Amino acid sequence: MLKSSKKEDDSKKNHDNKSIFHLRKLFSPIKSLFSNKVPDDFFSVIKRLKTNSQKMTLDERNILANLLKLKGKTIEDIMVPRSDIAAIKLTTNIEELNESIKVKIPHTRTLIYDGTLDNIVGFIHIKDLFKALVTKQNFRLKKLIRKHIIAAPSMKLLDLLAKMRREKTHIAIVIDEYGGTDGLVTIEDVMEALVGRIDDEHDQKSEYDNYKVINNSTIISNARVEVEVLEEIIGEKLKDDDDEFDTISGLVLTKMGNVPAVGTKINVSENIEIEVTDANPRSLKQVKITLKNSLKRAKSS
């Protein structure tokens, strides 16, 4: 039996880890196409690029192959079904929200409904909720709601991606023929279909789901916690407006170019060091954040 070389094995192992970082390079010449519905001739252009380019890496060629496969895929192929949707009632009070954070909010974004799940009014971001729970002044859940978009299950995935970009939102509610809620799809779901598994936002909640301030210089955090949340805690800006990542995981992957091994330490600024404390070959799970200067205000999720 033929055995692959170590170099070939390492290439395969790192393939999925690095692919997301080729997207910006691949799409920069054609990103204007995503401002509207994706035209059919877009795919012929991509096919020619895939066939004729001699300068593309294996990762880039595979992403283009996945892009071509997405041509016929619809929202229905990847959506989270209604039965698996976690949502909160619009009338939920602050005490109930405190409990929901512990047991009912597994993701950074959670849907809000009025009356029944067929009447989704929007979604809240966990960072907005944390701020509101800290202040507790004139708390109204309605003030925290962000807009979502509506889509049919038959909508093509690339058309959905274009619409999400245009509307500047990451969540779409899928409706059935009667106007009821049929499912949910996030931009992460679409990107996973394009580049392979990024990190499953729909996994069971783990012990690392939020973050914990250990002391004035140390934070233990789930790698999926958003960078904006970390910025608020430490009082330091880590993300530029044009950066295309949202989470601590995205920050680390952008710095490293791959998924670093457990124990790897990354200096993301003069004041901040991030150490990988839990990871698998495909994604980061947990990190330890160490600050040379103390936190401006210590708080825990």
Swiss-Prot record:
One Pfam match: CorC_HlyC
Annotated SMART domains: CorC_HlyC
Record-annotated CBS domain positions: 79-141, 144-201
Keywords: CBS domain, Repeat
Highest rank taxon of the organism: Bacteria
PROSITE patterns: CBS
Record InterPro entries: CBS_dom, CBS_dom_sf, FAD-bd_PCMH-like_sf, FAD-bd_PCMH_sub2, Ion_transp-like_CBS, Transptr-assoc_dom
Family affiliation: Belongs to the UPF0053 family. Hemolysin C subfamily.
Misc. comment: It is not know if this bacteria is hemolytic.
Name assigned to this protein: Possible hemolysin C
Gene name per UniProt: tlyC
